[in-house]
Amino acid sequence: MASPNRHWPSMFRSNLACNIQQQQQPDMNGNGSSSSSFLLSPPTAATTGNGKPSLLSSGCEEGTRNPEPKPRWNPRPEQIRILEGIFNSGMVNPPRDEIRRIRLQLQEYGQVGDANVFYWFQNRKSRTKNKLRAAGHHHHHGRAAALPRASAPPSTNIVLPSAAAAAPLTPPRRHLLAATSSSSSSSDRSSGSSKSVKPAAAALLTSAAIDLFSPAPAPTTQLPACQLYYHSHPTPLARDDQLITSPESSSLLLQWPASQYMPATELGGVLGSSSHTQTPAAITTHPSTISPSVLLGLCNEALGQHQQETMDDMMITCSNPSKVFDHHSMDDMSCTDAVSAVNRDDEKARLGLLHYGIGVTAAANPAPHHHHHHHHLASPVHDAVSAADASTAAMILPFTTTAAATPSNVVATSSALADQLQGLLDAGLLQGGAAPPPPSATVVAVSRDDETMCTKTTSYSFPATMHLNVKMFGEAAVLVRYSGEPVLVDDSGVTVEPLQQGATYYVLVSEEAVH
């Protein structure tokens, strides 16, 4: 090991020489020892033979000219605060240049020397190390006392080997950082370099994070006592009353077993099922408070998109009429009249004059009333409007009416309408107890006047589950699909298959039936 006083300032050498000379002066004067006179020059000889002052005499004179502080130095509170701040910042073993700067900073509050600063840092490190050792010893005894009661199972006893029992336990995490800094400072004492402990602290935090997220191994007899204690005590779970933040969420959290976490998929399923199961209760709360007129408006509003699609189909058909009416050679069909007719029917539907209950009532009349020439087959519509007051509630509210008060065909379609309720409710078309609109099909009646070469069209909306009587448009009327394929009818003129939902049909009517 190098000399411990190699970095000491020069004042210690001068003071040591003066002390030795003062102790040897009585022997020189009293006994006249030759050895004393040989080692030390007499006090009267201030210079050597060549006229230069001796080392010891010059040191004493320097000590008398520049008085140094006493060996026992009592720092002031201001100086202690400065030193503590420097020590806590990470400089636990300052070099010689830093000691001089610190001494100049401390001299503003009182006389201090370089040696005082050096020894203060050494004593401060020793006190820190002693505190850490005492704290680790205290926690070691506390864990050893709690180990047999906490980690051992009730039926078996864990016997630790001598090597594991003699192994030093890991100190608490709050003291681990300070212990690392003290050990690094003690290793740097001989070299005199100042190394910061921040890299060591960063490495410690990284290793601690890895230790926290690593899986816990199975407890065996080869593990230290502290690891057995930690692994046998999992993290306590929060109670149910701490997790529940609102009365609405209590039914969701209490029906699941307590666990450390719940996957996001399961949580989403719980919330989705809860909102789905609560929807029918809200819908069936007030089923009889909605009037038929309000439900009629909801039906028309929900089918606005379907009516727009019907208009698009009419536009396509008008642009290529020979594709549908190739059997009757209606090439002079006017697209403007077709679009205007659809627009008028759309306005009637929004005003409540044309809805899904009209077609069923009109189908019961085998002989419709025909108006004068140039009227566009409006008789089924007018007959249906006259009977709309009696059949609106039966078609819109199938669950609140009786079979005796409704026609037979209305009762037949009520069961089919009931099957569509749940699907429309789940689709979000209805809100708060409104009844869903029944499925419908669009029928467009097309007639052509051979004299004026003008084509007239009229659009109707019928329930999709009914069998349409084509003869209501005339004895020679023909029903075709939008692709031009004719629809099969029986001898009485009723379609063999019911109308398809959302489909568009065309009725080819001769002008004689209109007159």
Curated annotation (Swiss-Prot):
Residues 68-132 bind DNA. It comes from Oryza sativa subsp. japonica (Rice). CDD domains: homeodomain. Residues 130-143 have a biased composition (Basic residues). Residues 144-156, 177-195 have a biased composition (Low complexity). It comes from the Eukaryota. Residues 62-71 have a biased composition (Basic and acidic residues). GO terms for cellular component: nucleus. Residues 23-76, 130-156, 176-195 are annotated as: Disordered. The keyword DNA-binding applies. The keyword Transcription regulation applies. Residues 23-32, 44-57 have a biased composition (Polar residues). Transcription factor which may be involved in developmental processes. One of its GO terms (molecular function) is DNA binding. Keywords: Developmental protein, DNA-binding, Homeobox, Nucleus, Transcription, Transcription regulation. InterPro entries: HD (IPR001356), Homeodomain-like_sf (IPR009057), WOX8/9-like (IPR044557). Belongs to the WUS homeobox family. It is found in: Nucleus. This is WUSCHEL-related homeobox 12. One of its GO terms (biological process) is regulation of developmental process.
